[in-house]
């Protein structure tokens, strides 16, 4: 499909990207029309997709997209969450019309509908999940391109790109590869230099994971501020003025503080004491009488 041109051959870095994203890993089920794209079957039952055929079909799909004069006439669709961000990024890079989320039935066939469109080419992420736009495309003679897994039905699909269309990294990488090839064939970017856009921008991210990362970053920032505050706290300033001594041989004059005077008493005067020889009180006599009775 590449015409034996070295420029269009798959590079080693592209193969490494495919392997890292798991693009070559299919499912455990196999559609009879997808047998031509299978390289081998693993011992655990997972089919391995031939990446050479994937690259050839990717170039064919890019040529079909470039053949459309108006980029807005290309509709890219993804009803699954894993491909919605990739579809929007692809549309922003190539000028296509994205439909991310639920596809409204009748968009291609019902002319009185507000969202009615007449595209010239349709690209879907999953033929099984996006069966409604594929069915309507068959009614209006609309050519279609689809990212197909080993168990994907190929009905109403004109150009099938064999890949793993279930994983978020694989789907994002395929849309990134397709956008890069489209821009290269249009002459927007050069093949000699790498594309400055990273594939990570096309990957789907779970909102819960994003929220957890933001919370972790906020906690880390707060901890860092507290740690720095302990070490960078300003030292207390001593505002007490020190006495200036010109001649160190002279003593420092200490300011005199008046001493409060208290009245003095005559300690020689003895207080009057009671007569210890006096008879005990009546209460003591009563106690003595009580003890006498007990005896």
UniProtKB/Swiss-Prot annotation:
Pfam annotation, one family: Ribosomal_S2
CDD domains recorded: RPS2
Ranges annotated as spanning the membrane: none
Superkingdom of source: Eukaryota
Residue numbers spanned by region Disordered: 266-295
Modified residues (N-acetylserine): 2
Modified residues (N6-acetyllysine): 52, 89
Alphabetical UniProt keywords: Acetylation, Cell membrane, Cytoplasm, Host cell receptor for virus entry, Isopeptide bond, Membrane, Nucleus, Phosphoprotein, Receptor, Repeat, Ribonucleoprotein, Ribosomal protein, Ubl conjugation
Per UniProt, location of the Glycyl lysine isopeptide (Lys-Gly) (interchain with G-Cter in SUMO2) cross-link in this chain: 89
Site feature location: Cleavage: 115-116, 133-134
Region (Interaction with PPP1R16B): 54-113
Family statement: Belongs to the universal ribosomal protein uS2 family.
Function in brief: Required for the assembly and/or stability of the 40S ribosomal subunit. Required for the processing of the 20S rRNA-precursor to mature 18S rRNA in a late step of the maturation of 40S ribosomal subunits. Also functions as a cell surface receptor for laminin. Plays a role in cell adhesion to the basement membrane and in the consequent activation of signaling transduction pathways. May play a role in cell fate determination and tissue morphogenesis. Also acts as a receptor for several other ligands, including the pathogenic prion protein, viruses, and bacteria.
Quaternary assembly: Monomer (37LRP) and homodimer (67LR). Component of the small ribosomal subunit. Mature ribosomes consist of a small (40S) and a large (60S) subunit. The 40S subunit contains about 33 different proteins and 1 molecule of RNA (18S). The 60S subunit contains about 49 different proteins and 3 molecules of RNA (28S, 5.8S and 5S). Interacts with RPS21. Interacts with several laminins including at least LAMB1. Interacts with MDK. The mature dimeric form interacts with PPP1R16B (via its fourth ankyrin repeat). Interacts with PPP1CA only in the presence of PPP1R16B.
Note: This protein appears to have acquired a second function as a laminin receptor specifically in the vertebrate lineage.
Name of this chain's protein: Small ribosomal subunit protein uS2
Gene source species: Sus scrofa
The gene coding this protein: RPSA
């Amino acid at each position: 499909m590449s015409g034996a041109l070295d420029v269009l051959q798959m590079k080693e870095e592209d193969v490494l990207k495919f392997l890292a994203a798991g693009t070559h890993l299919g499912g455990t089920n196999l559609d009879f029309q997808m047998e031509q794209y299978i390289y081998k079957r693993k011992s655990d039952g997972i089919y391995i997709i031939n990446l050479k055929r994937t690259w050839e079909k990717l170039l064919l799909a890019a040529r079909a997209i470039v053949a459309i004069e108006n980029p807005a006439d290309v509709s890219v669709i993804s009803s699954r969450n894993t491909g919605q961000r990739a579809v929007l990024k692809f549309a922003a890079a190539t000028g296509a019309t994205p439909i991310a989320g639920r596809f409204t039935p009748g968009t291609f066939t019902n002319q009185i509908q507000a969202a009615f469109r007449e595209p010239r080419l349709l690209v879907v992420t999953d033929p099984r999940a996006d069966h409604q736009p594929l069915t309507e495309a068959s009614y209006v003679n609309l050519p279609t391109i689809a990212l197909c897994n080993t168990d994907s039905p190929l009905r109403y699909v004109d150009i099938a790109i064999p890949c793993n269309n279930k994983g978020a990294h694989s789907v994002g990488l395929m849309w990134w590869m397709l956008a890069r090839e489209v821009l290269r064939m249009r002459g927007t970017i050069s093949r000699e230099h790498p594309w400055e856009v990273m594939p990570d921008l096309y990957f789907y991210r779970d909102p819960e994971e994003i929220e957890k990362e933001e919370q972790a970053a906020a906690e880390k920032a707060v901890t860092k501020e507290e740690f720095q505050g302990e070490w960078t706290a300003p030292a207390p300033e001593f505002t007490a003025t020190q006495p200036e001594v010109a001649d160190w041989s002279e003593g420092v004059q200490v300011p005199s503080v008046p001493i409060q005077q208290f009245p003095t008493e005559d300690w020689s005067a003895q207080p009057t004491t009671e007569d210890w020889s006096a008879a005990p009180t009546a209460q003591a006599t009563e106690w003595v009488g009580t003890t006498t009775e007990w005896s």
